[in-house]
Structure formats: structure tokens, C-alpha cells
Amino acid sequence: MSGWESYYKTEGDEEAEEEQEENLEASGDYKYSGRDSLIFLVDASKAMFESQSEDELTPFDMSIQCIQSVYISKIISSDRDLLAVVFYGTEKDKNSVNFKNIYVLQELDNPGAKRILELDQFKGQQGQKRFQDMMGHGSDYSLSEVLWVCANLFSDVQFKMSHKRIMLFTNEDNPHGNDSAKASRARTKAGDLRDTGIFLDLMHLKKPGGFDISLFYRDIISIAEDEDLRVHFEESSKLEDLLRKVRAKETRKRALSRLKLKLNKDIVISVGIYNLVQKALKPPPIKLYRETNEPVKTKTRTFNTSTGGLLLPSDTKRSQIYGSRQIILEKEETEELKRFDDPGLMLMGFKPLVLLKKHHYLRPSLFVYPEESLVIGSSTLFSALLIKCLEKEVAALCRYTPRRNIPPYFVALVPQEEELDDQKIQVTPPGFQLVFLPFADDKRKMPFTEKIMATPEQVGKMKAIVEKLRFTYRSDSFENPVLQQHFRNLEALALDLMEPEQAVDLTLPKVEAMNKRLGSLVDEFKELVYPPDYNPEGKVTKRKHDNEGSGSKRPKVEYSEEELKTHISKGTLGKFTVPMLKEACRAYGLKSGLKKQELLEALTKHFQD
């Protein structure tokens, strides 16, 4: 009997997606709670097209290249997010409310190759001329009207949005210096946007005499409490500086789930679970229709094998053979079997940090931070708990249930103290590292071959080699070369480039530099460790383990018909292992699948008939 989880499910169905998102939010699931939406608001006045030297890019060129970089990264990481490009300070206008000097180039939609190519036509000298012919330059704009147009773009979107942001690119620090009424309306409109959950980020560019943010934009932009203020107040003079600033603002902190931490029956606080490190993977392949090259939507239907009729979810049930009887389970019963506990963290006790060993590591840890959305006052109690755990050097042991249908984990909440750099900027946030603890079956005894201990002289020589090869390691300095080349190939296909850009493999060792540093240490180490006649390129003879015989094979196990019938009648056939069941099916010429349940059904049906 088949399951019912995917009845009439259509992948890509937007209505189903919205319903699924609401259900996942209610259950504390990991799935996203909506789409990110981002509007690039670019100043198109004449000053943005003037560079301070011939070798430098114009502020407008830097802005366009930054926007293209975000488009490409969004296509790779989250292609369901919504992006838009709006120019203000243009001679011509194009917007839904017919405001002057505002040109909406791209409305909020998914990023794609066509949009990147559309931006590409405005780069360089030829792009500047094309922009002049297509839109022109104007100065009689109102920033409040510009923000109004952006707010309308957000309101026209039918999807559920988790974050709504505007990135403003400009090199004009006082746009309404001669018109206090326009400046006042702009400040009011920016406050209205902030109240409705729309955040405005300033990407200010270098101008002659410097960019003074206090003249106007200090009251306009939105700054979170935990944000790096240097990112806001540093003006960008180079493309690398602007890219760094945009990347710092592009990614929003998104909780994997928001759960309740139960300290006891009466005291509950709400926390957010965050994933600080995520392994980068290739995106999954998408099935396309051969004739039109459009994505294929998968639909699942269940039919009766005897009549060919369509089965509804109420027509099917789950079954399990136990004790020679077929046990029928209803849908509610199977769901109840999967449900162990409500999503959340249950405090079980405290243990000293010294009891947490390195070999207890199972998987990357998560990060726990207080949330005020579910329980008001959680931050205060969370902070008190963190301080006491740091003082007493203990970890909180908890039972962690991430979702309703997931078995609970035993975890240790390891306290983490806040760290600041020399300029009092937060480097490490305060909170708890959620460390997954192993179960008994996760700990195994691994057979180790007997090793020959190194002599003190050999150890000393290796220490000297390691000391020579030391360098400052930064994880963000090394990229996965396979992934980088994969994305460059996709970029070349999407943008119709002649050939993809070759990715540099930064993981390869710098052999020449290493040899120069080590000098004669390598040869000295070889003389100490390896015998004189050692050939590193020679074939190594594989040693056989003591328990391995010379060509001995596992004998086949045969079962008599009476023995199998006895087990079937007593309902003990399920005690047989899968290899034993396969051998029995093979002996009687029975065709069956690879699963144990299918093997049991084949043997039972054969002997009962």
C-alpha cells in the first residue's frame, strides 16, 4: 500500500507554496518563511557619470557592476528572490504613478540572464551615451516620490516576502540642500517605510571633498543594532570597497527556526536557531521538457493495479506484517508514530564543559540566540542564563526537537562570550553553540593497526618543518574550485560568452614557495624516517589481515521448506536478515525487491499459496 504524503502535489505551484510556507512557520520548520526582495535605487544625475581620473570607473559604472554581481550571486544561491532596478534623476520617467525624473528599469522579479544583459548595455563610454539617449539626466526630483515608487513596487508583489530592502547608490550627500520642504518629506517617507518593514541601506560613493552622511542621510537610512557601523559610514572609492559593502548588506540573518526553550514546566523563553556555516553545494538539476525547454512540473497520482481506477488519499492505508498478520494503520496513526514531541528545546540539566570531548563531534553546530517574537522578556532571561553558564563553566544539556515529525536529539548548549575588536565592533556574538551529542550506536570501536612510534629526533625535525610552513589561515581565502568552475560555466552559457572564465584553484599547495622555505629540511627528514633503498613511486604490497583466509568465501546458507513454513506460521520470519531472505528467495526462484518487507511478502505468499 502506498503512502499519502504527495497526493496531487504539483511542484512549482505557487498557491501550494504559500500554504506550505505558512504551515512550516507554524511548526517551527527550517524552510524559508518568504522571499527576499531587494530594490537597487541608483542616482542617475550627471555627477554619477564623472570619474576623478581617467583610470577610475565612474560611480555609475561601479553601481551597475555591483548590481550585476548581486544578480549573479542570487541566481546561484537563491534564484527565487525578487530584484528590481530603479533610476532617479533621469530626464524621462517610467513608473506606475507618473512621478517625474524616476525611471523603473526592472520591476521586482526573479533574477535572470536577460536582466544582467540589459544592465550590461549601460557600462562604459558607449553605455553612457546609450543611457543619455534612452533616459537622459535631470535634477528636479523628489526623494520622497522616489521612495513612494519603491513602496508601490513592493505592494504590487503577490508573493509572501520575508525581507524588503532598498539599496541606494549615490555620491550626492545633500540632495535637497536648497529645498527644506522636500528634505522634510523625504525624512517622513523614509520613516513610514521603516514602520512598514522596508529598510533603506545607503551605498554612498566617493565625491570630491568627501561624502558627509550627517547632512541628510543619517536620518534616512536604517541601521540594525548589531550592524557594523563602519560599513555604513565608509564611502566607497573603489569597486572592491563597494562590493564588500554590498555583500555585507545583501545577506540577511535568517533563523532556521524559532522555538521555545523550556527551562521547566512554568518558565519558557523563545529562541532562534541559526546556521552560521553552510556547506556550498551544486544546485539540483531541473527537469526540462524536450520540445520547449521549459521546466517540467511533476504530479503524483495513485492508481488501483487491478482496475486502473484513480485512488484518493482516503482509499489507501499503510500495512505492516507482524506475527503472520497484516496490521492496517490509518493515516492519523502513522503520523502519530512519527511524532515524538512538540518542536522546541527542553532543559535536562547542566554538565561541566570539560566533559565535552572532541571525539563527541557529530556534525556542525548551530547557534542559539534569543527571540522576542514568541515570548516577551526572553532576551533578559537568556542573557542571565548565558552569564551564569560562563561563570560556572557549564553547558546546558537539552532535548532538541527541530520539527514535529523528527526524532529528538540530545544537545549541549555551550556558552559563547561576546568578542569585540580594537574598535569595539562585535566579532563574535554572545549566545549558545548548539552541539549535537552522540547516541550509543554513534560510538564504535575502530580497528587500528599497530603503529611504529617516531623517535624524538624525527619528531623534532617534523616540528621544524611545520614551523617553516606556518601561515595565517582564513577560511574565506579558499574557494571550492569545482563549484567555482561550475558556476562560471553556467554564467558563460546564460550570458552567451565565448568561453567560461577559468577558476583559480587556491587549494593547490604552492610548491615552489614551500621548497624555498624548507631548504634542506625535507631531505634531512627523509634520511631520518625512510630506509636507504626506499622508492616512493614503487608499488605497495597490500598486507592481509590475520582473519582473512586465502581465497575462502562465505558458504551459502540453505533453508528447508519445513523450516521456512515453521517460521512463517510462528511469525518469526522477520528475524531473518536481508541476505538470508534474499538467499531463500533465490533458492525457490522468487522475484522480489530489495527491501526486507518485499522479501517477507514474497516468501509468505509463496508458502501460503
UniProtKB/Swiss-Prot annotation:
Acidic residues bias: start-end ranges: 12-24
Listed Pfam families: Ku, Ku_C, Ku_N, SAP
Endpoints of the signal sequence: none
PTM annotation, UniProt: Phosphorylation by PRKDC may enhance helicase activity. Phosphorylation of Ser-51 does not affect DNA repair. ADP-ribosylated by PARP3.
Main location: nucleus
Entry keyword set: Acetylation, Activator, ADP-ribosylation, ATP-binding, Chromosome, Cytoplasm, DNA damage, DNA recombination, DNA repair, DNA-binding, Helicase, Host-virus interaction, Hydrolase, Immunity, Innate immunity, Isopeptide bond, Lyase, Methylation, Multifunctional enzyme, Nucleotide-binding, Nucleus, Phosphoprotein, Systemic lupus erythematosus, Transcription, Transcription regulation, Ubl conjugation
Positions carrying N6-acetyllysine: 31, 317, 331, 338, 461, 539, 542, 544, 553, 556
GO CC aspect terms: chromosome, telomeric region; cytosol; DNA-dependent protein kinase complex; DNA-dependent protein kinase-DNA ligase 4 complex; extracellular region; ficolin-1-rich granule lumen; Ku70:Ku80 complex; membrane
This enzyme's EC code(s): 3.6.4.-, 4.2.99.-
SMART domains: Ku78, SAP
Modified residues (Phosphothreonine): 455
Start and end residues of each stretch annotated as Interaction with XRCC5: 373-482
Sequence segments annotated as region (Interaction with BAX): 578-583
Active site (record annotation): 31
Occurrences of domain Ku (ranges): 261-468
More details: Individuals with systemic lupus erythematosus (SLE) and related disorders produce extremely large amounts of autoantibodies to XRCC5 and XRCC6. Existence of a major autoantigenic epitope or epitopes on the C-terminal 190 amino acids of XRCC6 containing the leucine repeat. The majority of autoantibodies to XRCC6 in most sera from patients with SLE seem to be reactive with this region.
Family, per entry: Belongs to the ku70 family.
Protein name: X-ray repair cross-complementing protein 6
Organism: Homo sapiens
Organism placement in taxonomy: Eukaryota, Metazoa, Chordata, Craniata, Vertebrata
Encoding gene (name): XRCC6
